[in-house]
């Protein structure tokens, strides 16, 4: 298992905040079994695997965005049928 450093990952993302957001989303994909790893899985935890993928340059927001499904729902759709009168 190769050691992953923040500096290795920052070569492929703009800042630490973006690194945290990207690695979190990717680790969740790997942990839930939704996506296959892009590198050989070396008995690492999903978070380490996500960081290894970012450090290798095979994972970025464009790959994550392809996998995300965003459904547009009205914020207050559940309350449309209720009246606004005070009780």
Curated annotation (Swiss-Prot):
This is DNA-directed RNA polymerase subunit omega. Belongs to the RNA polymerase subunit omega family. It is an enzyme of class 2 (transferase). Its EC number is 2.7.7.6. SMART domains: RNA_pol_Rpb6. One of its GO terms (biological process) is DNA-templated transcription. The RNAP catalytic core consists of 2 alpha, 1 beta, 1 beta' and 1 omega subunit. When a sigma factor is associated with the core the holoenzyme is formed, which can initiate transcription. It catalyses: RNA(n) + a ribonucleoside 5'-triphosphate = RNA(n+1) + diphosphate. InterPro entries: DNA-dir_RNA_pol_omega (IPR003716), Pol_omega/Rpo6/RPB6 (IPR006110), RPB6/omega-like_sf (IPR036161). Pfam families: RNA_pol_Rpb6. Gene3D superfamilies: 3.90.940.10. The gene is rpoZ. GO terms for molecular function: DNA binding; DNA-directed RNA polymerase activity. GO terms for cellular component: DNA-directed RNA polymerase complex. Keywords: DNA-directed RNA polymerase, Nucleotidyltransferase, Transcription, Transferase. It comes from Pseudomonas syringae pv. syringae (strain B728a). The keyword Plastid does not apply. The keyword Transferase applies. Promotes RNA polymerase assembly. Latches the N- and C-terminal regions of the beta' subunit thereby facilitating its interaction with the beta and alpha subunits.
